[in-house]
Structure formats: structure tokens, C-alpha cells
Amino acid sequence: MKNNLHVFLGATVADAAARPLHWVYNQKKLNSYIKGKKDFTFLKKNKSPFYNIKTGKVSGYNEIGQVMFQTLLENYEDIEKEFKKNILKNFGPGSKYWKNLNLRSKYKKVKDWRGMIKGPWIHQNIIETVNNIKSNKKISGGVKVNESDGFCAALPYFLYGYDFKSLEKIIRIVTASKISLKYALAKFYIIDFALKGAKDPVHEFIKRFKKNTSFKVIVNDIKKIRRLNSKFHPITIKTVSYTHLTLPTTL
């Protein structure tokens, strides 16, 4: 399945394209940034209120996938072990990500301190993962937030052709949240259906898993999002529980 890596390439380009608008939660500001623009990908000027990196560079979500991809290219037998080493190397002490984490602690006393961060922003799941790996914990993934870091980390691994059972182990290296794990697996099933030629991969997921208790909430959320599909996006966001935004709002 290695020839399916075009999916990761597409995800990387999309991440870089949207990155200058990363985490712009203020709707009025967002509207002003994109006003009059037919194409607001790869904005030259950073608009993220949290951190500032050059246009063309990717966010931490894609970066963790890049670390996995590099681990796979190195062709180790024990991918899990080497992936953890590479996480420490790229995100842990001594890295630009960890340096900026320390600066965040320093700047927090300053109003609007987030805009002072020059360089990448390390995510909560990755902070926990780094600390847990250093502490030799059996399950290293973060548990404090329900985010998509685990999915992003496992995407290249999945596209290399590894099965769903081993996929869970990779996801748990970065996130141990039960909600994040379920949504990550759901996304992988949808991608799998798409790669196998399903006309409507999302509908195929609903059909296959509508009676599966593990995915019941996800199936219901997808149906809810599809009913709201014609609504103005901010209205949809407010309607759907924030906990479950990881998957359905993209459908």
C-alpha cells in the first residue's frame, strides 16, 4: 500500500496551505482576513494568534506525521521504539518545539503573550507524550485533550499497509484518549473505503458501522453534520459538541 502515500502528500500540502489561519477562533477577525479573497490558501502573512512560522511550513499536527514517515523510511524492525526516539529528538528537550514551550511559561504574564511565540507550537498531547516517554511509561499518549495528533501520527503508518490492530498501538503512542482513538479509527476506515473505490466513503462507513456500539456516537454525529451541511459554518460549529469536532466537521 506504499503507493497510497499520495494521501499523506495531499494532507501535508493542505496543512501548509491553511496553516497561516491556524486557530483563528475570532469569527470577525477571520472574516476580515479572508474578505475579498477568492483564494486564502498560503497567506503570505501569518494570522495565527498563537504562534508564527513561515508560510509553507506545516503545523505540529502534520509534523508528527512527518516524524513517523521519517521513522518508516529508516526501515527499523521495531517501529514503535524508534518512533518514540524520534519524537524525543524532534519535539523533546533541545528541540525548537520544547524551547518555545519554555518561552510560553515565561511569556504567560504578558497580555496577548501567544502572539510573541516565534516558531512552532507544541501540542498538549505531544507535551504529555514526551514526558511519558522520558518516564518510560507503558502507554505514552496524552489523555488531557481529545485532539487528532494520534491520527496524524499514524497516517503514514496506515498508508504503508499496516493493519488496524497494529494501528491502535501507534495512535496510543501519541494519544491515549478513548474519544481520540475512536475518531482516529473512524477516519482511517473512511480513508480505507475511499482508497478501495467507494463512491461515498462516509456513507459506506455509516452503513458498515451503524450497529457497532463503539462507533455509535460517531455515526450519529456524522448524520447530524450532514443535516447541517447547508448551514453557515459557525452555526454548525456551535450546534455540534466541541468534543466531537475532530471528525464530523470535515464531512
What are these regions (language model features)?
Residues 246-251:
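A short, hydrophobic C-terminal helix/tail in secreted or cell-surface proteins
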Residues 1-245:
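Structured, active/binding-site neighborhoods that engage oxygen-rich ligands
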